[in-house]
Amino acid sequence: MSLSLWQQCLARLQDELPATEFSMWIRPLQAELSDNTLALYAPNRFVLDWVRDKYLNNINGLLTSFCGADAPQLRFEVGTKPVTQTPQAAVTSNVAAPAQVAQTQPQRAAPSMRSGWDNVPAPAEPTYRSNVNVKHTFDNFVEGKSNQLARAAARQVADNPGGAYNPLFLYGGTGLGKTHLLHAVGNGIMARKPNAKVVYMHSERFVQDMVKALQNNAIEEFKRYYRSVDALLIDDIQFFANKERSQEEFFHTFNALLEGNQQIILTSDRYPKEINGVEDRLKSRFGWGLTVAIEPPELETRVAILMKKADENDIRLPGEVAFFIAKRLRSNVRELEGALNRVIANANFTGRAITIDFVREALRDLLALQEKLVTIDNIQKTVAEYYKIKVADLLSKRRSRSVARPRQMAMALAKELTNHSLPEIGDAFGGRDHTTVLHACRKIEQLREESHDIKEDFSNLIRTLSS
């Protein structure tokens, strides 16, 4: 049996799976083929369980298609493949990294997937008091399709700091949970190693600290502080734009931390290469580990967020009320929680039960503003401008891809961002049938899974229309 078998499986999996999934779950696996058994080694238990649950059938199917009745048995283990005398005895993943997902510099070794920091006995009192918010944990982060990969990547980093995906770069619009995940990682790291030095900050704080250090002739102390951390969590890295001295200092800090296997996690409101005013060498390094998007939450996740938030406040929120709010407020988690806080406050002040009519009254101005901001006309104009076509093209019978794909995108956005029915949306797009709208919505949903570009387009348009 050829020892290139796992390489064949990798090539097929890379073709079949979304690039982010392949990079996150399949690439870290190491393989060893022996005695008709293919052993797959995962860097930690979390990865092992995920791969076995989600991809076991895919891998077994490929083995059978390549080998037929002689397909090897699969075995999963945590750790690294054993060192053998024969170089061919072990096969590791060397498939080229997918573009724009996990980029590595040619002169730098690929990110390691070691088992994490060595466990050390916890001192009676931690020697360093972190500024991580203990209220933000993985347990109270509501997971959905829109943030599943980001949460999974953050969970792995918390379990394997300095090894799994370093740096981790999370990007997405305001209020989608990036900051929550930063703090959750920090809490996860300190749960495993209570004396770890974990520093969370907004990027502007880094700039302010550097300016003070320069004014006080204390730049060496500044460098020592930031390069001594076990994990550096920086929010809104886009605020480094056009701050050349800050970028220069962060560049050297970044390199020093990675060389020391110290974890870096960054967030931004946009993909690294789209951050204007930041040096290319920094943007390149941002992609050395793993880059994951967080998208606006889908309806089911919005409902779950409202129900969990209400439960945390000991408030009974009827399901139909949560659905009513979630259907109308779509842009981000912060907006949802703010609306719910207003509903709860009004209920406490008035002593009234929380019903749909009560919510409609309590959120009257917010709901009116939302309906005014997002209309089908607005969506059509925004999409046409984004794709550099005319609104008339969206309404026409033209079927060329340059028009059909934007039209499908606009229909999907209309379904996502407005309360119009499918027939109403179809009417607004040149009198099309509701089945055409349904097909468009399903097509865009499929393409968001398969195409990084379509996923980016959808997120960018959602962000534009919701701002």
Curated annotation (Swiss-Prot):
CDD domains, sorted: AAA, Bac_DnaA_C
Quote any Pfam family the record assigns.
DnaA_N
The segments labelled Domain II in the record are: 91-130
**Which Gene Ontology MF annotations are present?**
ATP binding; ATP hydrolysis activity; DNA replication origin binding; lipid binding
Supply the SMART domains for this chain.
AAA, Bac_DnaA_C
- Could you name the Gene Ontology cellular component terms for this entry? cytoplasm; plasma membrane
Classify the main location.
cytoplasm
What are the start and end residues of every segment in region (Domain III, AAA+ region)?
Answer: 131-347
Its GO biological process annotations read: DNA replication initiation; regulation of DNA replication
Chain intervals for the UniProt region annotation (Domain I, interacts with DnaA modulators): 1-90
- Region (Domain IV, binds dsDNA) spans which residues? 348-467
What keywords are assigned to this protein?
Answer: ATP-binding, Cytoplasm, DNA replication, DNA-binding, Lipid-binding, Nucleotide-binding
Tree of life domain: Bacteria
Q: Where in the cell is it found?
A: Cytoplasm
Residues binding ATP: 175, 177-179
Q: Which Gene3D superfamilies match?
A: 1.10.1750.10, 1.10.8.60, 3.30.300.180, P-loop containing nucleotide triphosphate hydrolases (3.40.50.300)
The record's listing under HAMAP family reads: DnaA_bact
Q: What is known of its domains?
A: Domain I is involved in oligomerization and binding regulators, domain II is flexibile and of varying length in different bacteria, domain III forms the AAA+ region, while domain IV binds dsDNA.
Assembly and interaction partners: Oligomerizes as a right-handed, spiral filament on DNA at oriC.
**Physiological role:** Plays an essential role in the initiation and regulation of chromosomal replication. ATP-DnaA binds to the origin of replication (oriC) to initiate formation of the DNA replication initiation complex once per cell cycle. Binds the DnaA box (a 9 base pair repeat at the origin) and separates the double-stranded (ds)DNA. Forms a right-handed helical filament on oriC DNA; dsDNA binds to the exterior of the filament while single-stranded (ss)DNA is stabiized in the filament's interior.
Looking up PANTHER family in the UniProt record yields:
CHROMOSOMAL REPLICATION INITIATOR PROTEIN DNAA
Q: Which family does it belong to?
A: Belongs to the DnaA family.
Q: What is this protein called?
A: Chromosomal replication initiator protein DnaA
